[in-house]
Amino acid sequence: MSRTLLPISLLALGLQACGAPEPAPAPEPESEVAEDPVRTADPFKRGLTEADFPRIQELAPGVYSYEQLRAAGEELFTTVSMFVVTDEGVLVADGQGNFEETALMVEEIGKITDQPISHVVICSDHGDHTAGNGAFPEGVEYIVHENSVAAMERIRERIPEIPMPETVMSDRMDLTLGGRAIEILFLGRAHTGGDLVVHLPEESVLFLTEAYLHRVYPAMRSAYPTEWVAMLRRAQEIGARVNVPGHGFVDSPEVLRDELQVAIEALETVIAESTRLHEMGLTPEEADEQADFGDLETWSLRESQRGMALRRVYMELNGELP
């Protein structure tokens, strides 16, 4: 039987936080991630309820994914963060979408470790991953790609409590934290202009933030469509055992690997169909009425993202992207 990702028992974590001098080992997890889950980002179609969140899973020793629900209109889906616990502090990859949800994540991290949060990597500069950054404790080092600085400044104009990152990187940053090697990489423009990924080479875990949307309709508001495909192919070449999405569910390593390819093919479908309609001379509005994106029409966020994705491909074809 292949290794699966195991949910943390939140009850056990709460007991660990009660201050016992030598806490007992956590009990065995109550359940495992399904070997072949329903392939959807809709929590209700998976038989989950709001009470099942946040979900925390240990991907490798001391490496955790954190899934919380967020709403887009009437739809609910997950926003995923990752955190790495070391003897010298905790690194968090992506916050959540508001102060309360990020504060809850900080609280849950505190149930797992007494180590302080030392680093926050802004992997996506979108507000659903950064608008709660003011909830992180003082003294945190924020890391951002140079292409995302302007976006963070715009968010801070709306939410002054958000700290501006002091560490600005370009292509690569290597950290050693508590003996762990952590690679922060820019693999190219994708969902945004400054997507960063966090790679743990020894644990073979790769956090792909919003560049990897697991059964969520390709969201292209600020994307670079064909560059996005190329970026994800470079991510595949890393060959990580666990590929963690920024939205959608954290499933078994095998499912996540397969679904990364599905996500690439979803992008290619949007690009190909939009290009076909563009070559017919249709306006974006006319194209939106005629477009057929196949199975993607059933994916989460189709209603809000379909037309936007088509228009973004048109912009790329017209040479209008920055």
How does the language model describe each region?
Residues F53, E58, N147-G188, T192-G194, ...:
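Metallo-beta-lactamase
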